[in-house]
From Swiss-Prot:
Site residues (Positions MEP for the nucleophilic attack), renumbered to this chain: 149, 201
The family this protein is said to belong to: Belongs to the IspD/TarI cytidylyltransferase family. IspD subfamily.
Transmembrane region(s): none
Reaction(s) catalysed by this chain's protein: 2-C-methyl-D-erythritol 4-phosphate + CTP + H(+) = 4-CDP-2-C-methyl-D-erythritol + diphosphate
The protein's name: 2-C-methyl-D-erythritol 4-phosphate cytidylyltransferase
Organism: Thermotoga neapolitana (strain ATCC 49049 / DSM 4359 / NBRC 107923 / NS-E)
Pathway: Isoprenoid biosynthesis; isopentenyl diphosphate biosynthesis via DXP pathway; isopentenyl diphosphate from 1-deoxy-D-xylulose 5-phosphate: step 2/6
Lineage: Bacteria, Thermotogati, Thermotogota, Thermotogae, Thermotogales
InterPro entries, sorted: IspD (IPR001228), IspD/TarI (IPR034683), ISPD_synthase_CS (IPR018294), Nucleotide-diphossugar_trans (IPR029044)
Annotated GO CC locations: cytosol
GO molecular function: 2-C-methyl-D-erythritol 4-phosphate cytidylyltransferase activity
């Protein structure tokens, strides 16, 4: 069984909106509904768990009804806590693989779901990532240091792992930037699937403006 975990419990404070970004309405749908649709429509995903904050539980339960939705789980104060809550919810089910995706990345392609999951099934762990094409600098007290960009990737989601591996990686109450980091610390190689610019994370107002433009054509582009 392959289960997707959709993380939608963040506050999105950097965006400066009263409503968490994943629940902002764009072209008639809340942002989290875009990746949710891709996950529900995917032939390789058997079930979906949505992780949301307590304040939004009732509204999400009322809004999303689908036979593939396994449960709506209360999120933690951090991303890592939210993932651990979802993994705990799945303890009795023990799926073979889990695919984790950030709801703040609304434009998820079904082909990326399939490719990341397939690679994880082959190697145990995989992530979507975008090869960097920009010049990189490190700024320290107005001093600029140029960082070689060769081999530099921007890590995206979805990320997929065997359930047992991700559960073991999150066995300690630690905080991580994503889910590949604790898995990598176990000595497991992370396979990389080439992503694209559409799978960006809505963080700032300019990201939201871009999302509004893409949403108008997403059904055609996706």
């Amino acid at each position: 069984m392959n289960v997707a975990i959709l993380l939608a419990a963040g506050k999105g404070e950097r965006l400066g909106e009263k409503v968490p970004k994943q629940f902002l309405e764009v072209e008639g749908r809340m942002l989290f509904e875009y990746p949710l649709k891709a996950l529900l429509d995917s032939n390789v995903i058997d079930a979906v768990v949505i992780v949301v904050s307590r304040d939004w539980m009732d509204r999400v339960v009322e809004k999303v009804k689908h036979e593939k939705i396994l449960g709506i789980v209360e999120g933690g104060k951090t991303r890592s806590q939210s993932v651990r809550n979802a993994l705990k919810f799945l303890e009795n089910i023990k799926p073979s693989y889990v695919l984790v995706h950030d709801a703040a990345r609304p434009f998820l392609r079904k082909k990326h779901i399939e490719e990341v999951l397939k690679k994880a099934q082959e190697t145990g762990a995989a992530t979507l990532a975008l090869k960097n094409s920009d010049t990189l600098i490190r700024l320290d007290d107005s001093r600029i240091e140029y960082v070689p960009r060769e081999g530099i990737y921007r890590v995206q989601t979805p990320q997929a792992f065997s359930y047992d591996l991700l559960k073991r990686a999150h066995s300690e109450e630690k905080e991580w930037a994503d889910d590949t980091e604790p898995v990598h610390r176990l000595g497991v190689k992370i396979s990389v699937v080439e992503g694209d610019l559409f799978c960006f994370k809505v963080t700032f107002k300019s990201d939201l403006e871009l999302a509004r433009l893409i949403a108008k054509e997403w059904e055609r582009i996706a």
